[in-house]
Every structure is written in structure tokens, then in C-alpha cells.
């Protein structure tokens, strides 16, 4: 095909897909219909439109500046960044991060390993879940890791009860937030965790109804990792399994697809599950499983560039556990 024709086709496709801020009212009406949104008053609708327009301007700016990722109008488009973070994340940072999980300092240079690794390809990662309007990302990331540990050890899937962890973990704060290593500690203290089918998710704080006779996974030891070298997460991922990590979710809210090169860290506020890494067009990236449903991002997943501390991924909070 003629190179000029090919360029015009590609350029035209990109232009057709691009947003125009002048069309914000049309996009907003489409958004209301698609996501079945309604508001209590016209003044509230106007306020939400103003937030929507601000988010649209950010999306347009990101799509212009980030050549390897795309951003879109999604279900969070009428929420301010602060609203999204307060309602749909849930990592809570106390003054004291110590507990009886063993602390491991990853201060040695990374080993030479494969350029690509993905636990999904080995069929060891359970389906994407949706935490809803409950700050329980910490519970989902922690149990997502245990679900993968179970799959690695027993070669079968099981979905564990985030609701049990929300209701029965008295160190963390349920839908008001928690941490990864303290959640592993809570599972150890409880003696185990039930299946989601026995203790279904309700997306709110409730009374503890744990039944020890129905525990399906028990934790024998937990770890918290201090990462000096970001690349060392590769070794950890391959040897341990999918790893719950802490990030700043502010820049991923309107993510659609691709490798994010720009993801700031203004403060850790969200927990996700690191499941793999790879290289695309010379850009190395991490693969992370989110808990905002399969209709967000790349079927519930997102990718960020490695070795730039994207979203603050290099920190003292990655955690894991061994199961019986």
C-alpha cells in the first residue's frame, strides 16, 4: 500500500477517535445514557457537567501527550478526581506499617530472567472483580494474591471472600481502607478465609459472620517487601506469584488501553495486583490487575512503563503470603 495512503488512513482513524472539547455537551448526554446516570436537580446536573468537561480536557491532553496509551470517557467521568479516589480505592497509610509479617529488603540487583512473564498465560489468575463504591481495594488485592497462590499450588481456581475480610479484619477499616500486609496478618489471625460463594460480597461494612468450618485457604506466613530496585519486582513476581502492590491511582482513572508513560505519585491510595511484565515496541512495562470491573481499561487490567516508578509502584508496601 502507498505510504501516503496508509498515513492518511491511520491519521484519519486517529482523528475520528479523538475527542473535541466543543462537543462536550453531546458527549455528556451520551455518557448519561450509556451509564444510566441521573441527578437530583438541574443544578446538580450542571455541576456534574462542569466536572465532566474538566475531565474531558484532561483526557484530550493525555491523549495528545502520551503516545503509547489512550484515555477515554468512562464511568468515572462525572466524578472529580478526589471523589473517585475517596470512593473507589481504599489504601490507608497509618503512621506505623510494622506488624509480624517478615520484612524483606530487595536491595540486590535483579537476576537475569525472561524478558516477558505473565501469570495469566499460566492460568493462575482469577477473573477481574469490581469493588464498587467501597474502599476495599486492599482486600481484593490481598485475596487476589491468595487466589493465585491456591491456583499455583492446587491447579484450580477459587474465589475468596473479600466481605469476610472487610467484616472480620479488626486491624484494617473495611470499606474505609486498609493495608496489604495487615490484611494477610488478619487472615492468619482469623485462621483462614471462606469462599466468596459462602460469604458473598456486599460492598459495605457488616458484622463478622466467619465460619471456621468453611475456611478454604489458610495462611502460614506473610511478607512485606522494601524495593530498592524496581526491576527486582520481576524476580519476586516469578518466584512468589502475583504480588499485591500499592500505587497512586489518580492518573489511571480515565485509562483505556496501552502503556502509561506518565503516572505520577502524589501519595499512595490504591492497591492492585501485579501479574506480569513484558516489552512492546522497545518499551518495558508492568501488567496490573485492577478491581474496577472488566469494563474498565484493558478488560480490567492496565499497563505502566517500568523503571520510572510509575504511579509510585516502587515503595515499602508490596506484600505476599504462603498458604498451607
From Swiss-Prot:
GO terms for biological process: proteolysis. Its EC number is 3.4.22.50. Residues 1-16 form the signal peptide. The keyword Repeat does not apply. Residues 17-113 form a propeptide. Pfam families: Inhibitor_I29, Peptidase_C1. It catalyses: Endopeptidase of broad specificity, hydrolyzing substrates of both cathepsin L and cathepsin B. GO terms for molecular function: cysteine-type peptidase activity. Keywords: Disulfide bond, Glycoprotein, Hydrolase, Protease, Signal, Thiol protease, Zymogen. InterPro entries: Papain-like_cys_pep_sf, Pept_asp_AS, Pept_cys_AS, Pept_his_AS, Peptidase_C1A, Peptidase_C1A_C, Peptidase_C1A_papain-like, Prot_inhib_I29. PROSITE patterns: THIOL_PROTEASE_ASN, THIOL_PROTEASE_CYS, THIOL_PROTEASE_HIS. CDD domains: Peptidase_C1A. Synthesized as an inactive proenzyme and activated by proteolytic removal of the inhibitory propeptide. The active site is at 137, 270, 290. Disulfide bonds join 134-175, 168-208, 263-311. Glycans are attached at residue 159. Cysteine protease that plays an essential role in host liquefaction to facilitate horizontal transmission of the virus. May participate in the degradation of foreign protein expressed by the baculovirus system. Belongs to the peptidase C1 family. This is Viral cathepsin. The gene is Vcath.
